[in-house]
Amino acid sequence: MKKIIKVFILLLACFFVSCSSSNIEDSESENIVATEKKQRSKKIKPIKYNEEEYEKAYNQRNYSTCLGMMLYKTRKKADIRDNLDLAMLYFITGEYAQASAVFEKTDAQMFDTLTKSITKSIGKAIVNENLKEYTGNVYEYLLVNTMNSLCYYLQGDLNSAVNQLTKLSDVKLPEYRRLYGEVLVKNGLDPSAREKLDEDAKSLSAYNIDSSVFTADLPKKPTEKDVYKESSLARYLSLILRQADGDKSQIDSDSIVLKSLVKDFDSVDSAIPSGKGRVNVLALAGLIGKQTAKEVYFPSKSTYFYVPTGNSSYRLLPVQFKFVYPSYAGKSTVSGVDVVLNNVGTKSAVIIENFNANLEKSVKLRARKEYAASMNRSITKKVSGIVAGIASINASYEGLKMLSGRSIAYTLASIAFDALCSSTAAGLSAIDLTETADIRQGEFFPETVNAAGFTVPAGLYKGKVVYRFSDGSVVEKPFETEVKEGKPSLVVSSCIK
């Protein structure tokens, strides 16, 4: 009999691996999940990190291999960027305890670096090289707590899940708004940076280069609409988890904010009629898109400005300018998500959080300033290179003239002079290789988080989440949950592909 029970528990645990589902009040089944996950985590071993193999595994959606390589990469030291991916890889592979531990660490890292450097990194980035330390995109700063709340919930720890949402609403959001409130949408540049640009513009005009053309492709100024201010997913979870915890103090405020953020949100989610219960289904679908580097060349990628090297050498030095900034033009891979509750009905899930849209907003906030920063760096380097190059070429030419009449020596010096001119031009072109856009981001967030709900009598319910993708593929994930009178249940399902 004991063997039968053990087999049954193992099968039940395996079911939860494929599609996490739980009733908020029933922690026993979640304890089974946590135990099973802990046992599985021992089998995941670090795999020697290889960038090419890692990218291949990413493209194939081989998350176990990605996790193994990320474990190897972060075994000694992990920055925010790597920790974001490590936490989400743990989440995707069902290792919720490990994911939560890494999210906690990442949260502390982001809070420390962001609160100390946000004004410098955004307001004064134009006079500095690209920051080496990654502080996270704005939505990542807030959603790290939201995802951690989900991790705690999936381990059956409702109290810690709610605490993450409280930390977000009471501590991080006010601090975030204070720091970001004015900085992000300013059009003006740091005064010292503007002075430097004006100085460089004068230097370029001496070489008959009109730097005003460089602003022709300046990205649009961000607006208030581009500022990520709230996590609708956090509000949704707060609405359900606090209600399950017996806390109804924020139901009205959460409902109002959520309705303003998600127009199609069903207001019935905030209230459970007498004698009924609620099945809430949260579905994580797809994989977030990636930023790309936008490169702009002046005069163009195939043409140059020509700078005279002086009256003595009569050479023209080809000069080209390259500026970079982050760009995003990702396409949705998720066509839709439907939730089927057996013997009850089918509903199309509403997008609660769109990570692609979050990423696009983040790019719009940064693009203009990062273009200006790139312009400053590139011009400064090129002007320095031009000045040094002209000085070397003219000095070499004066030496060449002194050898006039000495056929062999003059011939050798002429060859050396031509080589110097060529290498100077090549050196100026090589400067462009150092100019790269900062397109770092967490790569394993879902594309969308979708939600649907059913008001039903108490009882056991079965159903499935149907994921439809733009490539025509359809994936179904079954679930089972218990509904108690007056209480919400939350099913968490995912198909990250």
Task: Go through the PLM ranges and name each one.
Residues F15-S18:
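C-terminal motif of bacterial Sec signal peptides marking the signal peptidase cleavage site
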Residues Y397-K497:
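C-terminal soluble interaction/assembly domains
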Residues S20-N23:
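Bacterial signal peptide processing site
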Residues K56, L89-Y90, C151, L241:
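Residue-level signature for tetratricopeptide repeat
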